[in-house]
């Protein structure tokens, strides 16, 4: 279907608006469409019925992965992620936009460089990946403030409500962000097909109006005013029906919800609690939104991990390949057709962008690791499932039925959900009745087929389901005109090539399977041993039974070749689409899917294309890898791998075979301990000579924070003064009267924060932090103070990000950072006058390239010494491995060169060692803050930094702040640069984002 012209879209939008109901909300006009059909007038490219979306009139399954571009600040690597997601068999990515990174100052929207959205859109289009845009304004996402910029703490209104001050505060951001998204809509030739207004608008409390339909409508109208014309889709936090179509004002076009059924108990990864596998999603969908396709906008693909947690490898163990097998097939049993996995690639909470409930890594235990690696078994297992769905269009029109036990199998230990096709083609999802069972269960299937009701296996042997496993058995499955009456082995994919068809089946270890094909032809084994294979004719069908083997067998029945694989072997197979022209595949359609070939290629196959007689494969390798091409196009004569011609042979079955040799290159990394380290005391504020006259006076008698009243004479909430990120430093001046004996202070910086206090140059003590503690009370004994003498209390606080705001009305995002209360014995609280600082300039932040959150308030940060080429020549020598002999904060900087080989993707890590002392460190790499280490809290000790932030062939600048919170000081036990397996890659060059070097900052103090 043709794209609508800009004029046509404008005209139809005007018609739709003219037919709408208008009413007023706090001075703003709300547009409510009384008839959902009116929304269709905005565009006719993305449509839907009760079963699925249609794009350009073709029914489509959206298999999607969540990716946040802001968690990988190297735009030239975004295409790498899209390649790896497309290789899974996915066709879509969902993404958040983080408001806090784009409007650090009210009214000053900046989306440039690493924050620009257009390169993300361009990369998606090049990879042939559709996009679901989720700009918020609230996103949650385990980011600081849930995506709300810190200055919203000063808004005199309830967040995520119809309060006018809040709505006005969002207008500029949404107008700009949504406009950028609008330009990338499919109606403009871009990849964006759906738009999600708000995010998990699913809970309220505390007397605030919730749900507020007018608020939701306002959010949608903001997007429409910015020229968003694609359908609105929601992500209710649970299947509760909020804002579902037909619910009136604030209703979205398509209802969707989230689900994290296994939770986040990464400390106990083998525990699958009773009752956590959903079994009622289909029923709820029919109750809540029966006219729209069943949509899971966020389904668990990993888990977050808090400070002090067990680490993300444990989170992967919790949500691993067994989870994906059981839970994702269960989701398919409900007929899901928009299916987004959160997260598919997690990334990194660099530059203070995370919330206090998490640390620097946002690996999430995702299918793709933080280092963009695809070696996790979950990645491969999901690839098998996604390619099956892609090859099975009849899934989208099959009708899910009720969960059963004892109906389709001969045992009550198994449960089966059928999806019955209106035309031939049904699917039977089998799992353990006790979904967490780790037992292997033998069974026979009882299936209705076109050949009658059958008990399977019909030949010898029994079927088995291993523990924590699930299968989809197909019945009357169409392989280009050949009817697969049933298969107990799972389908990976099928293709029709010139002269024959190929069906790829796989099974688990020690399993027996059976396949029936409607055919009058005989069974011929054309590759592999016939050991363990039996076959017979029965009526107009042939039946084949076999034991799963790690050795491939190929059987031929007529023009159908059936590849019999074990699951681990199937992991090495890929199904790239061949572009009709050029080298990019374009968006998937039934036509492009039919053009696919099947390739066995090991670690990663990014894509394939045909150039005359040359078949080109673009792939990555982490070992010497045999390559096979199944279904090479007619006319293809030569094989090229990553641009290099590769010799190949062709066997009797037409399969091309070649091999890529892998020889790991020599990787030479500098010893960080041997660098020429320079040291600077970055806490000069405790010295008697320090001048804080340029600092902000904390003299507001009232806070603008409506959430928490003051317990101090003037506000000491950092956001009242424009400081929202990183370290905070306070200096309190008073004149002693000689009666002071102790000082009490309550500080707040979010979970796992720390604080330290000095009186003049005398260290009083620290709150060293705990994973559970968002704030801390400390009382410090004072020596006799001299009456009439001026004293200064210096307080350093680690702000680990602002809280999220999930529940409307709780206003948790407004939980302040800084000093909540204090008491100096013998003095009135007003006797102390305070000054404070955070990042230089606060909301007028200095580094526009790295954004508003990257820097905190340390002296070295305010000066910009964490950037490349600091003026360190005159600094004294000193290493973080020598550290500090007393409490304080040191700053260390050094440089080193890298010369890593081109054509290799080499994951690099900065490792701090397992040091449990009360010390905190910040890691800066070429000016980007890429790690916050907290020894006594943990768990993260290893910090991956991607190419682009690190210059793999050039000079790099590394800086560390080291904060000793105990009286005996602190040092790093170790500090090393390491790597893991180099990957020979066909990706191409990685371009570094801007890395502004040090320049003297005007007004720096």
From Swiss-Prot:
Its EC number is 3.2.1.23. GO terms for biological process: lactose catabolic process; polysaccharide catabolic process. Keywords: Carbohydrate metabolism, Disulfide bond, Glycoprotein, Glycosidase, Hydrolase, Polysaccharide degradation, Secreted, Signal. InterPro entries: Betagal_dom2, Betagal_dom2_sf, BetaGal_dom3, BetaGal_dom3_sf, BetaGal_jelly_roll_dom, Galactose-bd-like_sf, Gly_Hdrlase_35_cat, Glyco_hydro_35_CS. It is found in: Secreted. It catalyses: Hydrolysis of terminal non-reducing beta-D-galactose residues in beta-D-galactosides. Residues 1-18 form the signal peptide. This is Beta-galactosidase A.
